[in-house]
Curated annotation (Swiss-Prot):
The modification Phosphoserine is found at S424, S538, S541. The keyword Zinc does not apply. Residues 382-481, 496-561 are annotated as: Disordered. This is Neuronal acetylcholine receptor subunit alpha-4. It is linked to Epilepsy, nocturnal frontal lobe, 1: An autosomal dominant focal epilepsy characterized by nocturnal seizures with hyperkinetic automatisms and poorly organized stereotyped movements. Component of neuronal acetylcholine receptors (nAChRs) that function as pentameric, ligand-gated cation channels with high calcium permeability among other activities. nAChRs are excitatory neurotrasnmitter receptors formed by a collection of nAChR subunits known to mediate synaptic transmission in the nervous system and the neuromuscular junction. Each nAchR subunit confers differential attributes to channel properties, including activation, deactivation and desensitization kinetics, pH sensitivity, cation permeability, and binding to allosteric modulators. It is a multi-pass membrane protein. The keyword Membrane applies. Residues 501-511 have a biased composition (Low complexity). Residues 1-26 form the signal peptide. InterPro entries: Neur_chan_lig-bd, Neur_chan_lig-bd_sf, Neur_channel, Neuro-gated_channel_TM_sf, Neuro_actylchol_rec, Neurotrans-gated_channel_TM, Neurotransmitter_ion_chnl_CS, Nicotinic_acetylcholine_rcpt. Neuronal AChR is composed of two different types of subunits: alpha and beta. CHRNA4 forms heteropentameric neuronal acetylcholine receptors with CHRNB2 and CHRNB4, as well as CHRNA5 and CHRNB3 as accesory subunits. Found in two major stoichiometric forms, LS (low agonist sensitivity): (CHRNA4)3:(CHRNB2)2 and HS (high agonist sensitivity): (CHRNA4)2:(CHRNB2)3, the two stoichiometric forms differ in their unitary conductance, calcium permeability, ACh sensitivity and potentiation by divalent cation. Cells produce predominantly an (CHRNA4)3:(CHRNB2)2 nAChR.
Amino acid sequence: MELGGPGAPRLLPPLLLLLGTGLLRASSHVETRAHAEERLLKKLFSGYNKWSRPVANISDVVLVRFGLSIAQLIDVDEKNQMMTTNVWVKQEWHDYKLRWDPADYENVTSIRIPSELIWRPDIVLYNNADGDFAVTHLTKAHLFHDGRVQWTPPAIYKSSCSIDVTFFPFDQQNCTMKFGSWTYDKAKIDLVNMHSRVDQLDFWESGEWVIVDAVGTYNTRKYECCAEIYPDITYAFVIRRLPLFYTINLIIPCLLISCLTVLVFYLPSECGEKITLCISVLLSLTVFLLLITEIIPSTSLVIPLIGEYLLFTMIFVTLSIVITVFVLNVHHRSPRTHTMPTWVRRVFLDIVPRLLLMKRPSVVKDNCRRLIESMHKMASAPRFWPEPEGEPPATSGTQSLHPPSPSFCVPLDVPAEPGPSCKSPSDQLPPQQPLEAEKASPHPSPGPCRPPHGTQAPGLAKARSLSVQHMSSPGEAVEGGVRCRSRSIQYCVPRDDAAPEADGQAAGALASRNTHSAELPPPDQPSPCKCTCKKEPSSVSPSATVKTRSTKAPPPHLPLSPALTRAVEGVQYIADHLKAEDTDFSVKEDWKYVAMVIDRIFLWMFIIVCLLGTVGLFLPPWLAGMI
């Protein structure tokens, strides 16, 4: 049917009426739903008093179900002993005055209302340390048609917490949060634990602490102020510190600094930096101890384990300073200031080094000792240097006896290969070879000790003692016909120095020394003396190297002039001085070795202490299950 037909004007009014009626009904239904909550609020709060407990009878008890949900563990202040947490306080109770029938209000079963308009239990945090005891942000409450009220306001609490820093930084703390009504006793308001544990579904993990456990318990207590019994719900938080930060920044540096204390006793005493290192370690440990005192509570009844470790190490560092001063004193001792007791020599030079597996290096003083012994033998041997019984007869100026040097002149047989030779008392120098061959005369003569042919000398052989340079070369002539290269003590041995003592021959021998005779001696006379420079070995006495041509009578000794006597006294003085220096050096080395042994003893002691201290630092927390 078309609307433009003849019946169209008749159908249009009924359609418009039907459409208007539907729109009116829909608008009235929306208006009814919106006004239902308004009417409900007017009905609920008309004559409602939020100051009275929501009970029908005065003897009834309001049961409040209480729960806690933690959102974040903000901080644990060890210094002020506070725990800061962000929690949601769950509370639920029934208010009989806030009931309605949903059928009367367009099936409205629940509404959100401002919490300021209704009665709320005055539940506060008992062990609040700072801030507000009660909830400050009053959020809306969820009201159900049966009179049940749910209120979950957020809150940031700073609760007091007794911090136990015994195993710091491997510590585990037990902090509590105690909630309860401030004014209503158990006869008015009773608490019911909503959950046995704290809700951690929305917990944001902390970078320093981890919650091991959080359990809520219901308690009742009668306080001294009042006769009533007050209930409370206490949540015990078991939190454990994450020790990585403190291990990297506190424990490892402390251990390394403590190990430096061990190196103090390994540092040689000659360097002079032992005291400086000790004081530097002591100051470093003091700085770390100050860092710990800033972290731990100042009123703590216990000392943290790392504090005990640092304090123990500081005591040992202080002792190391005292010991180092003593060791340096021992190290620089000398025979002129201290005498080494026998027990010190026995204990620290014999017994303790063997126990510590120490082997003392040998002191290279053999050459010096041989040198001193040689000088003593040269200066004090009676067979070479007896006191002269009288002055020698006067001689001519050209043939006068020159005062010999501290060389030993004794008659020797003419060797197969005559010539001066030098032997060194030192093991480090090779034996010297003869520098020049000499021809031995086949006819003995009582003539004087002469140089080789072609060489004229003004007197006897002169050999320098304590020479430090080569005295001659193979082609060089020396005084008295003696050539030798010497680096140390030498003595000159005339080969044929005297004739057998016969009647009238002694005077002839002395007279023959005053002439420049170049004639060959008769066959029945001793040959002219030939001098050989020899070095005296340390282990062989000079008398052992002397070979006499005749064993029937001892050779006569040469008289000593005053100059030669002074030279002998000088050699004796030098030998005594060197011997005293050698003795002083040996005693000083003994004192230095005693200081080294004492250092080694305390080195091992401190190594053991550091190991035991490290084990003592980590073992108790490990046994307690905190590591």
